[in-house]
Amino acid sequence: MLNSRGIPLKDLSIVIVTWNAREVLLDALSSIERVVLARTGSGKIETETIVVDNGSEDGSVEAVRSRFPWVDLIDLPENLGFARGNNVGLNRSDGRHALLLNSDTLLLPDALESCVRFLDDNPSVGVVGPQLLNPDRSKQNCIHNFPSLISEIIPRGVLEKLFPKSFPSKRYPHEEPIEVDAVLGACLFVRREVLEEVGLMPEDYFFFLEETDWCFQIKKAGYKVVHVPTAQVVHIFGASTKKKMPTATRVEYHRSLYRFFRKNRNRFSWLILQTIRCLKLALYVVLGLFRAFLTKDLWGRWQADVRILSWHLIGQPAGWGLSGQRRNRKSS
């Protein structure tokens, strides 16, 4: 298979979007260098690595240029978000398959090769996700179900126990590949034909659920989404965003959740979802106030709940959340 310039396609294009995560990014690239590029023999796959820097201010760009000259580095002037950043990289890519890889990941031996082989051997599969591990090698949840009112009303743990095939999780591990709704975007393999037929990641999400929405569209097009548990990747977990701005992150998650329902469910479900979320937050605020007085460590959590409830009550202003912070920095 040739690209538009008549050059044979590489087996895999690795796309990493990063934002102010210099140290973990350098570790991720070192793992690619150690596990993939240094490999020899018949099992070696041809790869390219594209790093899309979302306007970092921590020296990430300079460090990558200095230490990893083999990386195709795209230096963006601002934070475009996860989906748009990945799409910039995907548009640059030339691989038969693409891997969307978080900056806070570490590759383990054979993870890439086994997922590429699985895609090659199963043309009906459009997306593959490996098993994500914590740094201590314990398992992370890396499978998503499509958001629904059922999963909002019934606790996730109950659904996993009653319907393990429909709601798979690390609690009930699978040894063989299993078809799922969606896999986590921290490490997501997608075949080139999907990009051409379905399109790139939906850009109406700034952060959260963009890969879930994408998998929804990919499955609608007739492709399968599969979790391959024998392929394993370490995920340090939220190094670039979740630990830095917890309240903004939670606001952004709510915004993405409501957007998913507007796009893929009906208006009634969308309204019911928001009602459920508001009632839950109000309950957390009332009960959490007493707990916060008793345990000062919970005071920050209670303040975050108040702010998120306020965001709902004043009409969900666009200036709040991660995307709002990007707009505010751009206008300043």
Predicted feature descriptions by range:
Residues 21-40:
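Short, well-formed alpha-helical segments that are part of the catalytic scaffolds
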Residues 31, 53-61, 78, 108:
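A conserved acidic beta->alpha catalytic loop
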Residues 75-93, 114:
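Glycine-rich, basic loop-to-helix element that forms the pyrophosphate-binding segment
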Residues 98:
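Short aromatic/hydrophobic "clamp" motif used to bind/position activated sugar donors
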Residues 106-142:
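Conserved donor NDP-sugar-binding/catalytic core segment of glycosyltransferases
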Residues 147-181:
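Short, flexible, basic/aromatic active-site loop/helix in glycosyltransferases
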Residues 173-175, 179-232:
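A short, conserved alpha-helix in the catalytic core of glycosyltransferases
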Residues 248-256, 267-332:
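Non-catalytic, C-terminal membrane-associated alpha-helical segments of glycosyltransferases
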